[in-house]
């Protein structure tokens, strides 16, 4: 007896897409990307070209307008008087608009320059004689009185007050009779003082000079000056130990400040 055996066929192995299909997909992808980039570049070029054409058209219209205006001035061409007057009025309105814009720009530049620059703040005053002299010297509101800005003022005839913070050069010159008989032989002392917005006072500068013994008046001068930071509402004044010895002649005793 003959026995037969049947063998099962082997399973077929799944294979991927052929190489030609892969190459086709790759080329298709490259083509699509290239087309997108080309379309974008063409759109940019077209946009710029349209802008250029628009500018050229505007220039051509301006050229035609100027030629027409020139013909109107010369009386050439077939334009009526009414059309020429209308063209001239348009041109005049255009010129007025340009001039107005230029004036506005100039005013804006001037305003910006003024805003960038700090206003000049300065003051110079001379002493004023008083029947009842006090240790804090008084200053004349007239004569050599100089105030260059409303940001500084003379208060109560004694103090120079500032309204803007900054560095100030403050100075004073006090002339006195060194040989005149005085209540004491103590040195003559002049002080430059600060009155702060909080109400406190302090000495900024101080100088002293000795007296002579002879009776005739021998004039001497004390000079004070320095740079200080002053705040809005602060004021400075001059104090002396013997106000009866101060000379109030023109140019002898003065006081002032200057914002740096």
UniProtKB/Swiss-Prot annotation:
Domain of life: Eukaryota
Glycosylation sites: 239
Extracellular side: 47-260
The entry's keywords: Cell membrane, Cytokine, Disulfide bond, Glycoprotein, Membrane, Secreted, Signal-anchor, Transmembrane, Transmembrane helix
GO BP terms: B cell differentiation; B cell proliferation; CD40 signaling pathway; cell surface receptor signaling pathway; inflammatory response; integrin-mediated signaling pathway; isotype switching; negative regulation of apoptotic process
PROSITE patterns in the record: THD_1 (PS00251), THD_2 (PS50049)
The THD domain, residue ranges: 121-260
Keyword match Membrane: yes
GO terms for cellular component: cell surface; external side of plasma membrane; extracellular space; Golgi apparatus
Coiled-coil segments: none
Record's keyword annotation contains Glycoprotein: yes
Post-translational modification: The soluble form derives from the membrane form by proteolytic processing.
Site entry: Cleavage: 111-112
Topological domains annotated Cytoplasmic: 1-22
Location in or out of the cell: Cell membrane; Cell surface
TM stretches of this protein: 23-46
Family of the protein in this entry: Belongs to the tumor necrosis factor family.
Complex and partners: Homotrimer. Interacts with CD28. CD40 ligand, soluble form: Exists as either a monomer or a homotrimer. Forms a ternary complex between CD40 and integrins for CD40-CD40LG signaling.
Protein name as it appears in the record: CD40 ligand
Organism: Canis lupus familiaris (Dog)
